[in-house]
Amino acid sequence: MDFITIDLKERSYPIYFAYDSFDKLGEIVKKHVRSSKTFIITDFNVYPLYFEKLNESLKKSRFDVSYEVIPAGETSKTMEMAQRLLEKAYDSGLLRDSSVIALGGGVVGDIAGFVAATYMRGIDFVQIPTTLLAQVDSSVGGKVAVNLKKGKNIVGAFHQPKMVYIDAAVLNTLDKREILGGLAEIIKYGIIWDFDLFEYIENNLHEILDLKEDKLKHIVKKSCEIKGKIVSLDEKEENLRSILNFGHTIGHAIEALTGYEWYIHGEAVAIGMVYACKLALNLGYIDEKYFERIFSLIQRTGLPTDYEDLHKEDIIKAIKLDKKNRSSKINFVLPCGFGKVEVISVREEEILKVLK
């Protein structure tokens, strides 16, 4: 099975790439966890599609499986839900050598990882992402968290998985909106690190949106390689890793202000990238031609490029809660060339100029 390795010394782990191979998962997981006792966390959307396949494969490999199904969506990523899951883990008899398996999208991965990171001060964690967004972003890198009412991912930890399993066949069950949400993050990687990837998406957009297997595999694997490289260089987001937040400063603000209900994460990031580029254009970091190229690709995908019914003053307030803003400064990840970004301290009045 094809795989890459995320290099974190003694905590390195593989990302496996497969197609419709859930029957092999039990054998693979067994190689990477310490005991056969495991706790699957999934949601009501994913449960009828893949739970039985995973459960059967694990039981063939003699796993003792317990599980919990949670409501789909960002509103499940709360301290209250985490407590419920932690209590279920305890009631199910999980010990320090047990594991948690996340079967689902980014929300499931985030909250399952948070449970794994905090239960008995940290137990083994396995990621099986079932959305394009989770495959290329949240399943890689070890950031796990839950939301507070006033901000996204405020309570969390760094807890690396023991392995990640990416099955391209699951993308066939996603609706177009979910595919586009993941594509927003892939476009992000092209802007911040590898402009060849950006150009590949420009040149193959139609086939990507048609879910051509070879095109999807290329952009998913390339995205994981890019994020893996960045994470291996800066695991705890002390410097370089913060560039992964391109588009997320305004994106997270939009999500919080709309109660995580109006926009899915990738849509908010797409809007955030457009506004980060507008800010970079105003400040002279990029020219009009560069801005138009990025705006054009995002628009061609069908992703939103602007927000509705929000006040700029409220967006500023939400931005100030952003974890990237140390001290009183407002930090933005801004493009400054092809495949290159920088973290820039920006004055509040400059941000207000580009917000509508």
UniProtKB/Swiss-Prot annotation:
**UniProt remark on cofactor binding:** Binds 1 divalent metal cation per subunit. Can use either Co(2+) or Zn(2+).
Q: List the disulfide bonds.
A: none
Q: Name one GO molecular function term.
A: 3-dehydroquinate synthase activity
- Binding locations of NAD(+): G106, V107, V108, G109, D110, T130, T131, K143, K152
The GO cellular component terms are: cytoplasm
Q: Which Pfam families match?
A: DHQ_synthase, DHQS_C
Report the EC code(s) recorded for this entry: 4.2.3.4
Q: Which reaction does it catalyse?
A: 7-phospho-2-dehydro-3-deoxy-D-arabino-heptonate = 3-dehydroquinate + phosphate
Name of the top EC class for this enzyme: lyase
On the tree of life, the source organism's domain of life is Bacteria
Task: State the needed cofactors, names only.
Answer: Co(2+); Zn(2+); NAD(+)
Subcellular localization is given as: Cytoplasm
**What is an annotated GO biological process for this record, any one?**
amino acid biosynthetic process
Alphabetized UniProt keyword annotations? Amino-acid biosynthesis, Aromatic amino acid biosynthesis, Cobalt, Cytoplasm, Lyase, Metal-binding, NAD, Nucleotide-binding, Zinc
Pathway given for this chain reads: Metabolic intermediate biosynthesis; chorismate biosynthesis; chorismate from D-erythrose 4-phosphate and phosphoenolpyruvate: step 2/7
InterPro entries for the chain: Dehydroquinate_synthase, DHQ_synth_AroB, DHQ_synth_fam, DHQS/DOIS_N, DHQS_C
Binding positions for Zn(2+)? E185, H248, H265
Major subcellular location class: cytoplasm
Entry's PANTHER family? Answer: 3-DEHYDROQUINATE SYNTHASE
Q: What does this protein do?
A: Catalyzes the conversion of 3-deoxy-D-arabino-heptulosonate 7-phosphate (DAHP) to dehydroquinate (DHQ).
Family, according to the entry, reads as follows: Belongs to the sugar phosphate cyclases superfamily. Dehydroquinate synthase family.
Protein's name in the database: 3-dehydroquinate synthase
| Natural source organism | Thermoanaerobacter sp. (strain X514)
